[in-house]
């Protein structure tokens, strides 16, 4: 057993609604608003694709998700050999970390961002350098630049960031990439890209033309509503993808996952409706005075800053909403209107100054 494994723990999902009801003595329906899933679910066309092809599950899938790869490549007007798929972005992060990191290497990222960057680096005996976020919840790109040296093998930028929901602009990311050594890959994790409405959000595909070391990651788990089918991908140089492919398990994206992802990707009208609903519901949270305690969000969740996260978590639970507690606040997945209205009422009546 690797020694460094001993300092890690397996991923711990939140308690189930049944367990929470028992622990808190609740006799109400509970709704899971803790994992940033799209509660409206996937496109009906994705569901139909699953039904249509369900009898094919006795066969192994085509390796590398070739139909989906070509669909995305054609849509984005890029070489399909620049795309690698994983069973969600978790596996993409694992494959990249395994392919690149060696003992003595280091990764540089933020102190409060997606934990799988740290986790996989430690597994590979790499050093993890975490730069604190700015007070507004944004990545401190200057702070990250100051930590990059000859031992830096990977830089991770979650944009928009999970769990804060904040983002770096196109201008900020471009200025950052100008200063990063060209041999250091910068992984830009855009898992929540489809929820963004900000005009100055980076066009990372465009930036890749100037900065080939900027690698872009996206997923079907969030806006496309396919979290249970595990499909994520990275767009990088052909050389990098060739090397990552050596690490990729042979049949890592299942048949039904690929069929559903293709159908979901083709149904952009449904995606636009999801985007519209999310933007409308997100705006409701920021209409209340208490929003001064929230980080700005370009995602399908709200991060609420509070010195009393446990109390806020339990107050939201009492109105039937399971959220995610952090040391400095609570992350709330944007749900259906009636769920959001309940949570907004709790936030309006919560004592943030206690």
From Swiss-Prot:
GO molecular function, one term: histidinol-phosphate transaminase activity
Residues that bear N6-(pyridoxal phosphate)lysine: 222
HAMAP family recorded: HisC_aminotrans_2
Native source organism of the sequence: Staphylococcus carnosus (strain TM300)
Keyword Iron: no
Chemical reaction(s) catalysed: L-histidinol phosphate + 2-oxoglutarate = 3-(imidazol-4-yl)-2-oxopropyl phosphate + L-glutamate
Name of encoding gene: hisC
Record-given protein name: Histidinol-phosphate aminotransferase
Family statement: Belongs to the class-II pyridoxal-phosphate-dependent aminotransferase family. Histidinol-phosphate aminotransferase subfamily.
One GO-annotated biological process of the protein: L-histidine biosynthetic process
Record-listed E.C. numbers: 2.6.1.9
Pfam families: Aminotran_1_2 (PF00155)
Oligomeric and partner information: Homodimer.
Residue ranges of the TM segments: none
UniProt entry keywords in alphabetical sequence: Amino-acid biosynthesis, Aminotransferase, Histidine biosynthesis, Pyridoxal phosphate, Transferase
Cofactor(s) annotated in UniProt: pyridoxal 5'-phosphate
Phylogenetic placement of the source organism: Bacteria, Bacillati, Bacillota, Bacilli, Bacillales
Pathway the protein contributes to: Amino-acid biosynthesis; L-histidine biosynthesis; L-histidine from 5-phospho-alpha-D-ribose 1-diphosphate: step 7/9
């Amino acid at each position: 057993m690797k020694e460094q494994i001993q300092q890690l723990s397996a991923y711990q999902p939140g308690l189930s609604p049944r367990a929470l009801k028992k622990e808190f003595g609740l006799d109400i329906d509970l709704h899971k608003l803790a994992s940033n899933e799209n509660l409206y679910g996937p496109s009906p066309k994705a569901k139909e694709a699953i039904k249509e092809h369900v009898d094919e599950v006795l066969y192994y899938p085509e390796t590398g998700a070739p139909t989906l790869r070509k669909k995305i490549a054609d849509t984005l007007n890029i070489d399909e050999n620049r795309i690698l798929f994983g069973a969600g972005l978790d596996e993409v992060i694992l494959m990249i970390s395994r392919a690149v990191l060696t003992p003595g290497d280091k990764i540089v990222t933020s102190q409060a961002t997606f934990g799988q960057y740290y986790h996989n680096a430690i597994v590979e005996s790499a050093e993890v350098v975490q730069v604190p976020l700015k007070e507004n919840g944004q990545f401190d790109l200057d702070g990250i630049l100051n930590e990059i040296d000859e031992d830096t093998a990977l830089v991770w930028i979650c944009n928009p960031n999970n769990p804060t929901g904040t983002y770096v602009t196109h201008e900020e990311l471009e200025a950052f990439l100008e200063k990063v050594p060209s041999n250091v890959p910068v992984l830009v994790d855009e898992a929540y890209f489809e929820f963004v409405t900000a005009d100055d959000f980076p066009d990372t595909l465009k930036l890749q033309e100037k900065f080939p070391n900027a690698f872009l990651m996206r997923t079907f788990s969030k806006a496309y509503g396919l979290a249970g089918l595990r499909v994520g991908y990275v767009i990088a140089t052909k050389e990098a993808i060739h090397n990552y492919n050596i690490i990729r398990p042979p049949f890592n994206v299942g048949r039904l996952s690929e069929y559903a992802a293709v159908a979901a990707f083709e149904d952009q009208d449904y995606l636009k409706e999801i985007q519209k609903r999310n933007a409308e519901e997100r705006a409701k949270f920021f209409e209340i005075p208490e929003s001064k305690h929230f980080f700005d969000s370009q995602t399908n969740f709200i991060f609420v800053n509070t010195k009393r996260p446990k109390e806020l978590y339990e107050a939201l639970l009492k109105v039937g909403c399971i959220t995610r507690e952090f040391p400095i606040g609570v992350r709330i997945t944007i749900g259906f209107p009636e769920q959001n209205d309940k949570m907004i009422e709790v936030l309006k009546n919560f004592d943030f100054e206690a």
